[in-house]
């Protein structure tokens, strides 16, 4: 007999250990001979990371699909692993060194520091893998990989060297996102855009050949900027070619204030006539948009910052080129050189104002890019880096999606993919870090580069080139973390070696991802997979939405609304969290996670637990001879028909990645059909003396429960596995753990029996609803009068009269030609069911109560309607508050309709 209460905490831990001891998730487990392979690559979480709600949704979706395919007999591999997370890991270890007052990274040296990181990785890194286990993910943990392990490192070197020798990797001087605190280039994903209350400075730039006069607009052009500190690197001014104000100035020159550099005035659509003054100063070396304008118009690039974002003027040849070194300029250089960029900003603005160049300063809220780890503003910085020719690699990746070789679900993300890929820029793959894949490039004494897989090969290449042995210096930079992640679908399977796993599982079957890394990860896996394997890495990309808080707000530390999945697991169980995420995971719709919903689905799990316990208490046991098609009782044939429909709904939902539809179908069947109706309808049989009927319902119930455990298993794996194990004693030994049992088939249908029982359920539900609406006392037995009932209704009443009376609290059932006066009427198929109300309630008192209720609701609706019609409320209130009020008015109108219907029944 099951315990009275389901103890999720202890059971989930025990079941997880049983799965691992059984090796239930190893590739090939549960598969049939010559089975079709099915492979999913777990997006490798950062080794520094901990489980968040995005992980929980992502891995729950994957696990549902993986468990489903495993139960269908496929040769399944869900490949787990972790990412070395370059910047994040290096920062964690550096912080640890500082806290322990140990030598710094620089004092320790590269080799010892990297050794220290490896120690940290083995001691405390990878906590997230154990957290994922708590969620119940069924990865093949015996194959866990790490992006820095030997095999993957070999793959990284192979790819880098191959691309270099194909001319697809090269070194170039371009703008990058530069973190002046961490002193490295970072990816766009590591940049956080923050809204700041900044300023827009309007400056007068003198026109060449004109005597500057602040009061004479013909002697200058006004430019607007949010970054005065970068003006030292200006090399041009852009105006829109359609802007009549400046058309006559196109092709002329202005003079850079304070410096004296000649600036070309160029026509470029980048300049917006409606923003600022319409004229934009162009600093190609310190702004990404300006870089493109400069490239289109052949403007010089002058870098005026150091790696630490300090002003760099002294010994800056590019800065002095073409300008007269006056005493004023010498003084400027002396005052600003080596100053922090923001200190320099204040000094430059003061000088511009002092010399009459400042027009005005406007308050100007705008976004500023910050490093998400360093917390300092990012600087577009001109530096030498390694780049991948992403545009060339993107061509086949674009074509593959056009041809349908890879599809996005929802398909709206395909447009986003094309937009990114068709406008792709060179991919900066070098990082100024110590932790990561060190770039396999060595430099000769004259700066010539030798790119090889090993130092020995590089020395041999250098010997061939120079004709003598020379010393080589290795490039100190490491590769962008996304470089190794892009190889994940084939490097984890043993590439560049031709392994059986590679032959079996590549291409993989599915990629599940958040929309924020379609470009950073999915697109790059597409490019690398096609280039090195000749096939797309996966035919399907399922893009899930964001998990937001219950009000629909994005979760963030600053808002204090982050929901910790581990706390939810502790409080409600992993299965309850998983089912909640699944049932809310509608395609293209963000998940608004309300803990009360998780509590509700914990109750759902309890409902099934109690149903199984109820079955045990009533002698339910397996009968090896039971076959659905042999069932005789209409109740059993009905539940078997409804079960088959549920099998179809759940299977179709998972196959089409509509997990919410599958979960909803399971919820309806288990809670309503099975527990509320089938088991309730069985009670008279359990309590009766008809042994044949009792034996059949006992065997059928055991069979149906088994099928339910199987269907629910991908969503709630722990509890279903426990129930599967504990119900083994009901007369049948289990052939294996539930995780490895065959998925159910929809093999039964009896629509006549289903129609009859559903009629009974509809009749009972309708009568119960009227009793509730009309406030009929629960103890009162009501007479039921049936009008216009034909042969079908007569037959059904004869078959199910006793059940109808018991469940609907009906005293007598009679047939009549017309409805009794003052009766509540319900239409059921061909007949009208009538409850004479005068015999059951005080009509006048009930009418007064309902009138009072409806009056209060109408007042509330009027107030809310006025509130929602007020533009100021809509404009000033938080969006989630507006949404709450809109939902409230919908609820009130629904209640209003119900009460109005009840009043109509009293007429």
UniProtKB/Swiss-Prot annotation:
GO terms for molecular function: aminoacyl-tRNA deacylase activity; ATP binding; valine-tRNA ligase activity. It is an enzyme of class 6 (ligase). GO terms for biological process: valyl-tRNA aminoacylation. It holds the Pfam family Anticodon_1. A motif ('KMSKS' region) lies at residues 554-558. It catalyses: tRNA(Val) + L-valine + ATP = L-valyl-tRNA(Val) + AMP + diphosphate. Gene3D superfamilies: HUPs (3.40.50.620), Isoleucyl-tRNA Synthetase, Domain 1 (1.10.730.10), Valyl-tRNA synthetase, C-terminal domain (1.10.287.380), Valyl/Leucyl/Isoleucyl-tRNA synthetase, editing domain (3.90.740.10). Monomer. Catalyzes the attachment of valine to tRNA(Val). As ValRS can inadvertently accommodate and process structurally similar amino acids such as threonine, to avoid such errors, it has a 'posttransfer' editing activity that hydrolyzes mischarged Thr-tRNA(Val) in a tRNA-dependent manner. This is Valine--tRNA ligase. It comes from Bartonella henselae (strain ATCC 49882 / DSM 28221 / CCUG 30454 / Houston 1).
